Design a protein with these regions (language model features):
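Structural microenvironment flanking redox-active thiols in thiol-disulfide oxidoreductases
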Residues: 110-175
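Short, acidic, Ser/Thr-enriched surface-loop or helix-capping motifs
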Residues: 79-81, 204-205
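Generic structural signal for well-ordered beta-strand positions
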Residues: 85-87, 211-212
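Structural micro-motif
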Residues: 95-96, 177-180, 195-202
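Short active-site neighborhood of thiol/selenol oxidoreductases, capturing the structured segment around
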Residues: 86-116, 128-133
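A generic structural motif
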Residues: 78, 89-92, 217-218
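N-terminal targeting signals for export/organelle localization
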Residues: 1-76
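Thiol-/selenol-based redox modules, centered on thioredoxin-like
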Residues: 34-35, 52, 185-245
Length: 245
């Protein structure tokens, strides 16, 4: 009896130690992830354990489940503008597809979007671009940032597809996103399939295989590697200057 009780107590102690250590590591990583472009994006205090699912997704994204050369998971999502649903396996038939995964509350996305627009302008004739709006990176009820308060980008987690679509529309207008935007369902199935949270780029070839996969955000969301990948995958036609920085 004592042996069984001792085993239970050790198990409880182990769980307490695990969650305590995870919380400490989480705050260290959050401090690191807030160092973007040489600026400190200070955290607004919030409940630590509410962030554990977010940290889990970030760790999964760093590891990644997909590799270049593998078949890209097919999906069908609603277009933000209400024009219908879009299936990846259909749109890639004519051109390679560039997938931009992000959300409005992600500061690195907002910082890098002008460069992404320039890549789109240079390659729109040779690749199909789709923005996939995913779960918020820094919703005020989960992982708020002072930089979002300063930029007046303060939003709670959308509770259904309609709310997420509304926030996606706000994002599209504010960030001047000209290419089609799709909205991930609130089960976040596409973002999970692509380990895309908080931000990530993919290029899917006409053969349905992954031709390029960026590092995950916040550090991997950069337009320059995407441009380089497209320059290698889609050489400019003779006499064209498209694709140059």
């Amino acid at each position: 009896m004592r042996r069984a009780l001792r085993a239970v107590l050790w198990s409880v102690a182990g769980l307490v130690l695990l969650y305590g250590t995870t919380a400490v590591v989480l705050f260290v990583l959050m401090g690191r992830s807030n160092l973007v472009a040489g600026k400190t994006l200070a955290l607004v205090p919030g409940p630590a354990f509410a962030l554990l699912p977010m940290e889990t997704m970030w760790c999964q994204a760093r590891k990644g489940d997909l590799a270049v050369g593998q078949a890209a998971p097919d999906f069908e999502l609603a277009a933000r503008d209400g024009s219908g649903r879009v299936r990846l396996s259909s749109v890639r038939q004519e051109k390679p597809v560039v997938l931009v995964f992000a959300s409005y509350t992600c500061p690195p996305f907002r910082r890098e979007m002008p460069g992404v627009r320039k890549v789109y302008e240079d390659y729109r004739d040779r690749a199909a671009f789709y923005f996939v709006y995913i779960e918020e990176a820094h919703a005020r009820d989960v992982w708020p940032l002072e930089s979002n308060v300063r930029d007046k980008v303060v939003y709670s987690t959308p509770q259904d597809l309609a709310e997420r679509t509304g926030l996606a529309t706000t994002c599209a207008k504010a960030m001047q996103i000209d290419f089609p935007m799709l909205v991930d369902d609130v089960d976040n199935s596409v973002a999970r399939a692509y380990t895309a949270w908080p931000t990530r780029f993919y290029v899917v070839g006409r053969d349905g295989r992954i031709a390029f996969k960026s590092r995950p955000g916040p550090f991997g969301f950069e337009a320059a590697p995407l441009r380089q990948a497209l320059a290698e995958l889609l050489p400019s036609p003779a006499g064209s200057s498209a694709g140059t920085p």
